[in-house]
Amino acid sequence: MEKLIDDEYKVTIIGNLIRDERKAQKKSASVIASLSGISQQFLSELERGKKSLPYSTVHSVFNVLNIHFDPDIELIRRADDLINNIINAYMNFDRDSMLSSLELLICNSYRYSYAYDYYQTAILLKDIFIKKVDKPVFIRHFKNPKLEMLNLICLEKTDSKNTMFYITQGLSYHSSTHTQPSYCGLYCILLFDLAEYHEKNNDLLKALSAYKEVIQAASANYFRRFSLSAELAYAITYSKLGDISLSQEYLERIISIAQPDDDIEKQIIYAAVINSATNFLIMGDYNKCQATAISLFNENISETNHNFVCYQLAFSNYMLGNTDKALNYCRHYKLSDNDRSFPADFIRMLISLKSDTPNEQMLIDLFSTALLNGDSSDVEVSFKLLTDVLKKNKDFAKAVEYYDKYIQYRFSKRI
């Protein structure tokens, strides 16, 4: 028993190390490896003594492995085998051990849900509910609204035909619990999904109402990540409804955050900057659009966001008459192997910049996108630009190839 207490102390120390590493935004692989060695000693004690670990020790192990607010799925899975070993060991012992194993199984399902792996969460929950049904002694112990709520979310995520049923059931059954911090995250997830459902059905006012509820619930319980995400969605929805000034008010509130807590909050702020620049573009304030978008041009952002920024900078410069700058930002637009297409406005802008002829690959992408979009004037002009460059480069084989595509397009339009 002294050995177990000693190991429990080590686990607490390691838990603090992991939390420190997370604050520094480092991977905790080495610390997980250290914990693994200690936990193997726990398992050996279990096998030798045929008895469960002290309840406090169980929670020390779990609290270290539990990666609630770290969406690093790789790290979660590395810890997974260890938790499953503990669960399997418990199942061979007395009732208290089985209760502990089920509790770890429940906690494991929460870990997966926080990493948005709802399929894996659903599998774990199914296992939990089967065990609960088979062993009536567990029913009272695990009559847990939070667990039921998580189950409804998983059903909603994996059964697209009955989405609204599960959302409504979850919100109505647990609407009185959202003021408690332990329920707030799940309550907000259901509200986000409700808003998304209304948006898909073009009911933007109902979507706004759902986002507003998220903001209120998350703010009351200091769930800043949820409240920021909801404020961003709220602002974007107002922009879709045409209320740009109110949209900007919410976006500027997000952008003003000086020190985001983590990388996810940073990405939310980046998204707010991009949407703010888009609003200025819609209003025709090209100087403000340019000044807003340029702040992200050299940031480490996703390819999709990078392309948004390039488009905003190119278009605002184009509208201000800075054609050289516009073309330069066009060339920074990244086309992936799977998607070599430009937005329609981008095509027209590039076409109008024909005096500063873009490179051959850009013109090929431009013509290909025009064919996909089917706008005849875009096709005609982009085809002429492309063939002029191919002839100039004496690349007659490629010129014939694209001439053939052009003829096929013209023939299909006649039909």
Feature annotation, model-predicted:
Residues 111-118, 143-150, 179-186, 226, ...:
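Structural signature of alpha-solenoid helical repeat junctions
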Residues 26-45:
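Short alpha-helical DNA-recognition segment
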Residues 102-109, 139-142, 169-179, 212-223, ...:
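Amphipathic alpha-helical segments of tetratricopeptide repeats
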Residues 54-72:
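DNA major-groove recognition helix of helix-turn-helix/homeodomain DNA-binding modules
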Residues 82-91, 118-131, 148-165, 186-201, ...:
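Tandem amphipathic alpha-helical repeat scaffolds
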Residues 391, 396-413:
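TPR/TPR-like (Sel1-like) alpha-helical repeat modules
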